[in-house]
């Protein structure tokens, strides 16, 4: 009995100090970011981009955390390249590593080289208010009030793709690709629509 116990102790000792255990507890470093660090407000959404920056969307502006410092972006009325509004409710990074920010007063695309924002507008020159976004091949789809817009990578243009004329109060709050040629559109109060991207027909 004593011999068996001694053998078990020796085996345990060898495993402990030679790293033979297949599962080792990992060590993780956590840092809390709060208002004291410059966090604008209540967090609404978070995105980690391709370069490792953490983007934090809040009710009072946008934050970018690099692991050491938090930089804040807010709307400035005299700056056309600031974010359109401080209330941020969604962010996404597309296949070209563009970061799109959906705000209460329009959508914005972050420009890394100039560290500011491009604000696309419609034919009338007004900011495009969008509620949802998804990433098909070749561009970005945005859901708006009874409309869907498409941003084309090739010519960097934003155009109206679809108008739901029979559904004047249809706010497209969720977009997802059903298949390669079909888009599923969801409205919080008005139900679902399936849109054929080739024909423009929906039901």
Regions inferred by a protein language model and the residue ranges of each:
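Carboxylate-rich, polar loop motifs that coordinate divalent cations or form catalytic acidic clusters
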Residues: 1-203
